[in-house]
Amino acid sequence: MATPELMLSLGLIEKDVNADTLWVWCYPSIDADLREVMLRKCCLTLDNQVLHTFVFGQFCRTWYYITTVEVQEPTVLKKVTHFSIVVTAKDFNPEKYAAFSRVLCRTYMKHGSPVKMMEGYIAVLTKGICQSDENGSFLIKDYDVRKALLAGSLKDVVSQFGMETIILYTALMLKKRVVVYHPRIEALLEFTRALPCLVWHRKDWSILHPFVHLENDELENLKVCTGYVAGFVDPEVKDRSDLFDVFVNLPDSEITVSQNAKEAMSMGKLHKEIGNFIVQAAEDADRSDAQVIKDISVKTKEILSNLMSLADHADNSKLTLECLKQGHYPPATENFLFHLAAAEQLLKI
Amino acid sequence: MEEVDRILIHSLRQAGTDIDEDVQSVKQFTSELIVEAVVRCLRVIDPAVGNGLSHSLPPGMSARFRLGMSLAQACQDVGFKGEIGYQTFLYSNEPEIRSLFMFLVERLPRESAEASDQPAGKSVLLQRAIAAQIKAQLSVPWLPPTCRLPVHRKTQSSGPCHSFHAQPLSLPCSLKVSSRKQPKEVQEYWRNYLLPVTAQPSQPASVPASLLENHISELSAAQEWESEWNSQGLLSRLTPEEYRSRKKARLQKRIEEQLRTAAQPRPDTHGATRSTSDLAELLQSFGGASTGGDVLTKGTRFTHTEKFTFTQEPEKAVQQMAAAASALPSSQQSEEDLKAQQEAELSALQQQLQQLSVQMEEVGGGIKQLTVSIQQVTDELQTREVTNAERENSVKIKRQTIDLLPDAENNLLKLQSLVESSSKRVVQLASQWEKHRVPLIDEHRRLKELCSNRESESSRKLSEIKDLHDKIRQSAEEAKKKESLYKQLLTEFETLSKDVSRSAYTIRILEIVGNIKKQKEEITKILSDTKDLQKEINGLTGKLDRTFAVTDELVFKDAKKDESVRKSYKYLAALHENCTQLIQTIEDTGTIMREIRDLEEQIETENGKRTVSNLEKILEDYKAIRQENSALAAKIREG
């Protein structure tokens, strides 16, 4: 799975004694738009000196991983106070790139030259291994993508929101837009990466935008996607009702469904059933997170196969509203199934 | 003493005492005058005390005595510490009276002097001028209109009075619109068609009011701009025009934002779409119109909203009216017909409505389905596009691989070596690039530092400039204040009565002070002379004593041997004794002379006290009292 060519580029941002943050180096290349976004994310441009050692996110289907370090002891980097190492890649695997960038950071701190860093990068690219000066070496094989996907804890999500988790489940199933707000980036990253696990059968992590600023370029990129999970640290996002169908206020443990999504998100007996199932599965102390995810996935597949069975087999296994109506479901369930069919691309057009 | 007396008399006159011109000193004061002066002073110092006393001496002796007693009491109440009684007033002597007057004059309040010390502003001056004018006008008696002279007509007729009624004026040169920027047409209008200001208002009487109003509005606008520019504009480091345009853009943006948030569509409110479209129109018109207008002119926003509310409504109203008019049935039809027709119409309409709502529902369901399917399709399209791109990539790679497949082992080796060599080359290139990059980055940082240094320097200078501005303003204000004060004082000085006495007094006082200084110098000189003399005397006495002792001893020694020497010793002793006596006598004479002088002085002071005349007066008064007493006793007896 973990093929090395998933890595796209390597970049270096430095903050110097003039409090000036600057892109100083990159290999092979990063386009200007992405560079600007990276500058915003690396938290060096902000005046408040809160340092986020590791952040990640997605922009235009490119994942970025930024490790920021403060230069403390006297090194070769005389005029530099902080620097960030930016790795962009095609795949979602925070742990892998965190480890890799830590190695790179140490190298750069020691030598003060990006050439050594680049040697490491090329080694990983060609051989899948990078020799570190201390602590052994970085082996790309150690980091399986499955592990990365399972790293988020659904149990924590359910323990925080309880029965309300069903709203998140429904929203994700119907490919709705979910916006999560928390003032701390770390909490945001932790929480949002767990949400796609609710729809494990799709294994689509491209809906995840864990760290978005309220800036035009990023919002444009977000609006292109049909459904997403986006994390914001800016409390103003609450007033941007054009950005979300479901708003999660993480510090207050509040979930709000926006007015224009209420109809599509109306819930019925089926939801109650699934909700109870999720809560029970998550509360079971013996079950691991992976097992919980699996349980939910099984349940989802059950629903989907139900839905498939309704489809007209003669007609390329596609559904119509009439087919659904023959099932005589309660209106809320019918509505849900109809939208679900659209989300799973089962509708006949 | 003459000077003191004149000052005293001047002050007493000011306090209200009527003193004859020929009275020049306190010595000339009669008892009546003294009583009057004291009472007047007391009235000024403490009205509660002074008002209970009469300022003229009563004819009856006992009444006079009582008045004297109460006056003495009042003086003590006010704070006079010296010896005082009825005799002070009735049988006056000069020094006592003088000290009493000096005390009283000192206690007189000096409000007039204090008031003139405080600086008065322009408004105070104006108010004073108004007060003076009103006083002057009030002093002129009112005359019936026919009897008025032209002088009176100005102030007493009601003819020229108008209410303050201002009208907007149009002026070619004003602060708000600089003449250069205006289009040619406007300039031509100014040149050829604009009426002079005197002809612009509808009534000629409101010309001054309008001009004043116009002037004040421009002045206040200019001041506002000045203060804003000094406080904020200067710090923004922009030229005034740039600052203005930036402020304009900012305001416009804010207003637009406010309107936009207010216009956010709410699904549960009916007619929201209408108001939003209206607001959108407004926004558009606002954006379009205000680009040409001047944001500083107040009321742009209001005129636009006005236009908006008043132009839209009438059109709609007209349309509605027309529709209603056509629907009205002709009144000539009978009522029943009308009813039946109405019912039929009603049912038909209801049917239509039902049909329409059913249709609506159907179409709504269709729309919903379609939107959902559109969503699905777009979603699918996106995923397809992504997978397509991925597949294309993989196809490319696979094709290359297939090309290399026939000679797999060789090619693999070749590829590996290629990868290795190219990675080495890349690293090499990177290190070469590093050689160029590092100096460039360093240069960038150095320049940036320089730049920030310069910036801080410039901001420092800017703050300095601001300080200077403040200082200039302060100084200007101060100068203005001082100038006005100077003017005020000048006018006051001109209006002051040319009373030379004051300057004369000051000159005299200065002279007196000079004299006193001179006298003091002389006294110190005499004192030092005296001291020198004393010293000399002491020295001589000591010398004498020593000489005598030595001579005495010498002569005494020889006296035992020689008879003639004994004789001379006796003479010596006698001489010494006589001389001592002589000195003693001289000293005694000195003391006696001094005593004589003291006594002479005492006699003079006693003479000054007019004892003889006072005694005669006392005797007379005593006789008068006795007469009064006997008269009273006779009356009692008769009664």
From Swiss-Prot, chain A:
Superkingdom per UniProt: Eukaryota
Family recorded in the similarity comment: Belongs to the DENND10 family.
Subcellular location: Late endosome
The protein, known as: DENN domain-containing protein 10
Organism classification: Eukaryota, Metazoa, Chordata, Craniata, Vertebrata
A Pfam family it matches: SPA
Signal peptide: none
Major localisation: other
Domain dDENN residue range list: 296-349
All copies of domain cDENN, residue ranges: 160-294
InterPro entries for the chain: FAM45, Tripartite_DENN
UniProt entry tagged with the keyword Repeat: no
GO biological process, one term: endosome transport via multivesicular body sorting pathway
Any one of the GO CC terms: late endosome
GO molecular function terms listed in the Swiss-Prot or TrEMBL record: guanyl-nucleotide exchange factor activity; small GTPase binding
Known function: Guanine nucleotide exchange factor (GEF) which may be involved in the regulation of late endocytic pathway homeostasis, including endosomal positioning, maturation and secretion.
Segments forming domain uDENN: 1-135
Keywords assigned: Endosome, Guanine-nucleotide releasing factor
TM ranges: none
From Swiss-Prot, chain B:
Subcellular locations according to the entry: Endosome; Cytoplasm, Cytoskeleton, Microtubule organizing center, Centrosome
Keyword Ribosomal protein assigned: no
Domain of life where this protein originates: Eukaryota
An annotated GO BP: positive regulation of ubiquitin-dependent protein catabolic process
Family the UniProt entry places it in: Belongs to the CCDC22 family.
Parts forming coiled coils: 331-370, 459-541, 591-638
Predominant subcellular localization, coarse grouping: other
Keywords tagged on the record: Coiled coil, Cytoplasm, Cytoskeleton, Endosome, Protein transport, Transport, Ubl conjugation pathway
Name of the protein this chain belongs to: Coiled-coil domain-containing protein 22
PANTHER family reported for this sequence: COILED-COIL DOMAIN-CONTAINING PROTEIN 22 (PTHR15668:SF4), JM1 PROTEIN (PTHR15668)
GO CC aspect terms: centrosome; endosome
Organism: Danio rerio (Zebrafish)
Known function: May be involved in regulation of NF-kappa-B signaling. May be involved in copper-dependent atp7a trafficking between the trans-Golgi network and vesicles in the cell periphery.
UniProt-recorded Gene Ontology molecular function terms: cullin family protein binding
Cystines in this chain: none
Residue intervals passing through the bilayer: none
Lineage: Eukaryota, Metazoa, Chordata, Craniata, Vertebrata
